[in-house]
């Protein structure tokens, strides 16, 4: 029945999508009916079910589980963020943050996050940045687009009164910017269902809770470099491998002030060094914002520099400010945001190098060996 239904829908309504919410490992849910795949020689699984897409329940569960943990313990669970790439291209996946995750006492996405109010909003921005740059289409339940505090109740409305306050407006601006980025950057949508659209730079720096990866489109010029920092401290002079020399423009920073962040970043661009790392011929020396995600794109300007040169950490996200109305700040900024201000120099002990973890993490016991991630996801 399902195969016949999907065949009929796509034949008669080619602009319609059928999407399966399915939590088993049944193969070929989003493969064509005449797929020809097989599982254990079972004739029933020789053909696909013909759905256009399928929910990625594994990604949802592992990712939310990681984000709910205090940053002190996240380094022990780095593989929860990288494991989804082992199977990300087995189906045409949708990344779902649905109503199922914000009902029956589970709390809203915002309330799941650890830390004070500022850290909760920064974690939510980080989650959305990861979601929008991860292969797969996006599903976000109502209320998530502005960071509702309370979980969904079917007998009432969502909390519209909170939607126009400072940090919630920042989340709305962030979602708008991520949607614009996804529509205008081919690397974020052209190869969502193809393993060639994703490539790891580094997935195993669990001590700093850092991930770095590439997204590829059909044109090599569209390649994006994404860097993720899952700790509440900035990492200065952090070296990340790069596939090309020259200049890399910072086209997105989840810590931009228009999103409610602290404007820690890279002044809008970084010039590559000709000293390679992570198996790449070049490298970028970056300032990673606390609980922040950065997206870079190569531009045709200067060649790689011969020697590293530290730069002050201050990003440019001014284009986003022009595109969206500025939110009215409260007369007195929330106390929780004060420790994260970019203007205040970070204590020396909190400055993170690639060779040492932040001070906040130095006193804990030796970490178990992080699970290694494969260099590339299977098709």
Per-segment meaning from a language model:
Residues 1-154, 183-255, 262-263:
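Conserved alpha/beta catalytic core and glycan-binding cleft of carbohydrate-active enzymes
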Residues 118-121, 130-140, 144-379:
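Carbohydrate-interacting/catalytic domains
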């Amino acid at each position: 029945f399902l195969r016949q239904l999907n065949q009929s829908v796509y034949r008669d309504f080619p602009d319609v999508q059928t999407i399966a919410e399915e939590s088993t490992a049944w193969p070929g849910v989003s493969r064509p009916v005449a797929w020809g795949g097989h599982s254990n020689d079972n004739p029933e699984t020789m053909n696909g079910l013909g759905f256009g897409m399928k929910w990625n329940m594994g990604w949802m569960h592992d990712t939310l589980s990681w984000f709910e943990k205090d940053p002190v313990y996240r380094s022990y669970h780095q593989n929860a963020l990288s494991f989804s790439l082992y199977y990300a291209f087995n189906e045409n996946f949708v990344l779902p943050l649905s109503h199922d995750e914000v009902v029956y006492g589970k709390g809203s996405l915002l309330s799941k996050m650890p830390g004070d109010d500022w850290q909760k909003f920064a974690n939510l921005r980080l989650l959305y940045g990861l979601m929008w740059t991860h292969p797969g289409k996006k599903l976000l339940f109502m209320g998530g687009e502005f960071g509702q505090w309370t979980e969904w109740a079917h007998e009432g409305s969502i909390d519209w009164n909170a939607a126009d306050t400072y940090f919630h407006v920042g989340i709305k601006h962030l979602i708008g910017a991520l949607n614009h980025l996804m529509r205008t950057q081919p690397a974020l949508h052209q190869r969502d269902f193809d393993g060639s659209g994703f490539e790891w730079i580094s997935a195993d720096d669990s001590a700093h809770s850092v991930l770095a990866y590439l997204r590829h489109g059909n044109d090599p010029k569209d390649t994006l470099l994404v860097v993720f920092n899952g700790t509440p401290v900035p990492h200065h002079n952090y070296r990340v491998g790069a596939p090309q020399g020259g200049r890399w423009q910072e086209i997105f920073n989840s810590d931009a002030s228009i999103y409610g962040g602290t404007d820690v970043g890279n002044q809008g661009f970084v010039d590559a060094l000709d000293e390679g790392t992570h198996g790449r011929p070049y490298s970028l020396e970056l300032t990673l914002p606390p609980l922040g995600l950065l997206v870079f794109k190569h531009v045709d300007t200067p060649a790689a520099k011969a020697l590293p040169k530290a730069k002050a950490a201050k990003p440019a996200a001014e284009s986003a400010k022009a595109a969206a109305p500025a939110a009215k700040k409260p007369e007195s900024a929330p106390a929780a945001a004060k420790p994260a201000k970019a203007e205040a120099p970070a204590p020396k002990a909190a400055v993170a190098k690639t060779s040492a973890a932040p001070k906040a993490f130095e006193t804990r016991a030796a970490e178990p060996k992080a699970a290694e991630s494969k260099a590339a996801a299977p098709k």
